[in-house]
Amino acid sequence: KNPVAPFEAICRKKMITIELHLESETLMVHADMEQILKTLQKQIQNDFPDAPSTSYEVKYVHPDLEEHLSPAFYLTPPIDTLSPNDIYINRHANMGGLELYTTLAHEGFPGHLYQTISFAASSPDPVRHLLPMGGYVEGWATYAESFAYRYYQPETTDGQFAWLNRSLNLCIMSLLDTGIHYNGWNQARCATFLSQLGVTDTAIQQEIYQVIVEDPANYLKYYLGCLQFLDLQQEARELAGDAFNLRDFHKKVLAIGPCQFPVLKQAVITSYSS
């Protein structure tokens, strides 16, 4: 089965190049980031359980830090106050349109902010807040982000196209991550791999290599974590059959909270098996 077949089909259907499509500005643009988050909270209601009421604020990264920080991030609040819930946007990334929309979904609803307050509402043992479950946390945010591509403009395939592109990029970076830190690829081997995929600019190849070398297994948290949630959802669908409800599935996953994926799978599958 060709994993990029849907991606190629959309390209043929629209009769456009990938570059032209991704640079298109025909998608709606939101100027108010807090309004985007409010819109997302309404859009997720059919697919995700209700989130506890909370306050949040969208802020900009200080100009002195823009070149050194991520395009966006959610600042996890102290466990004893659960506030403030701040999402920071880096203006240096110059995000807008679909990119900004899906980024706020990743960091806000139904991503990090939503998952954090939902887990806290279950009154977990405090020690669980100390356990760094990066695969669950970043995997959930990436999985949740994928829904925003459909919410953004549901009447077209634009969102599906963009998500496939995002997924392929994460896959490529994850393969490089594994190649470098597990198989021992050097910069020349990575350059060959990237060239085979059409990335031939040596400066870009070097930059990608350096980013991955400095942060081992980072991309795996996002991409493999997301795939774990997608696989778990598929297995739950097969067990539940026509009785499967996506909202209930997400409720089970959120109630269990951040943990190792074998633990999560056992708990979720057991609930469907019984």
Per-region residue spans from a language model:
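N-terminal maturation segment of proteins
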Residues: 1-274
